[in-house]
A protein has these predicted regions:
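Conserved acid/base catalytic micro-environments in cytosolic active-site loops
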Residues: 1-2, 6-22, 28, 33-36, ...
Length: 344
């Protein structure tokens, strides 16, 4: 589905998509409102969405488009989608899967068609269990009652957080509630294109009020720091003679995601056992569900974001429905709970 107010852009993008011979344009619409109406009765795999449009602009419509898409990936194609631009980061925070700078009218030549096909192909890569596929379905709501918060968190040394669509905003809310005195390490696996990871790290450092860096192989895990998985590798934790460290790997994960939350959770469970806390925030699919099970088996609590505050209650919903959530809470409450637990 193409959503762009420019007739020329819709025409050119349609030709390029059809020219891939792998993807087919089912509709090309000129405004976000029409797109929402179309998605009420039609299913698509990928949505190309412009930002600057009359009426409802793309950013304003994005959360509703993500929900109406029922698992469709949203690719922002806009002239204001420069990497690192505030608009781009906001789009990713609101649920876009990726962004692509749209050239000006009359400048659609060069490699743009090739880059567009590459982005579409990446968004539609097949996966093992639908975890990161374009048609992953959110689970049905589960009746999960949180246990008493203060009775839940025993002393811990590390927090591992997994998130995808809508997870950046949730992570921001969570980090704002963690006090500056918090000295436990925080690991984050967020589904984002590799090119955005350094901007993301800078953003988290400001929000979290503590150093944040993109993981490199054999990086030591130190107190009071945030480490995020790079976009092109899984983040795993290993024991070393000098303490815990990061190892990066690129093997296939069952979820099909790169990076995947499962390897992070599984390795954290192995190294830290009950001295860890797992968190699953808003995201499409089931990534993190298998790893959450390993954390629970090791005696570590797993906190899942609630459905009401999730852009997509896929990942946290899968954990809750599988009985692997110690508590289901809004992200700000998760942050306060973690902060209180560390202070005990």
């Amino acid at each position: 589905l193409i959503v762009d107010d420019s007739v020329v852009a819709r025409s050119v993008l349609s030709r390029m998509v059809e020219g891939t011979r792998r993807f087919h344009v089912v509709a090309a619409l000129g405004e976000a409102r029409s797109a929402l109406e179309y998605l009420r009765t039609n299913r698509v795999d990928i949505i190309l969405l412009d930002i600057a449009m009359p009426g409802i602009d793309g950013l304003t419509a994005l959360p509703d488009v993500v929900l109406a898409g029922q698992g469709a990936k949203v690719l922002i194609v806009s002239s204001s989608a420069d990497e690192g631009a505030a608009t781009t980061l906001q789009a990713l925070a609101l649920g876009a899967a990726d962004t692509l700078v749209k050239p000006g009218v009359g400048a659609f030549g060069g490699r743009f068609a090739e880059v567009l096909e590459e982005r579409l192909s990446k968004l539609f890569e097949p996966t093992g269990d639908g975890g990161c596929s374009a048609r992953a379905q959110p689970p049905s709501p589960a009746a999960v009652r949180p246990r008493s918060p203060l009775a839940m968190l025993e002393p811990f040394q590390i927090v591992a957080i997994g998130a995808s669509t809508g997870g950046i905003h949730a992570l921001s809310q969570l980090l704002r509630e963690i006090p500056a005195s918090f000295q436990q390490a925080i690991l984050v696996t967020q589904h984002l294109p590799p090119s955005f990871m350094h901007y993301f790290a800078t953003q988290l450092a400001v929000l979290g009020g503590r150093p944040c860096e993109v993981a490199t192989d054999r990086l030591r895990i130190r107190p009071g720091r945030i480490i995020i998985a790079p976009g092109e590798a899984h983040l795993r934790v290993v024991r070393t003679s000098e303490g815990a460290a990061i190892r990066l790997s690129t093997e296939w994960a069952k979820s099909g995601c790169m990076p995947s939350v499962d390897p992070m959770f599984e390795s954290v469970a192995e190294v830290y056992a009950s001295r860890a806390v797992g968190v699953v925030l808003s995201g499409m699919g089931r990534d993190g569900c298998e790893g959450a099970g390993r954390l629970i088996e090791a005696g570590a609590p797993v906190l899942a974001q609630d459905q009401a505050t999730s852009v997509v209650w896929g990942m946290p919903g899968a954990v809750a429905n599988a009985g692997r959530a110690t508590a289901v809470l809004p992200p700000d409450e998760i942050g306060r709970l973690i902060g209180r637990g560390a202070a005990r």
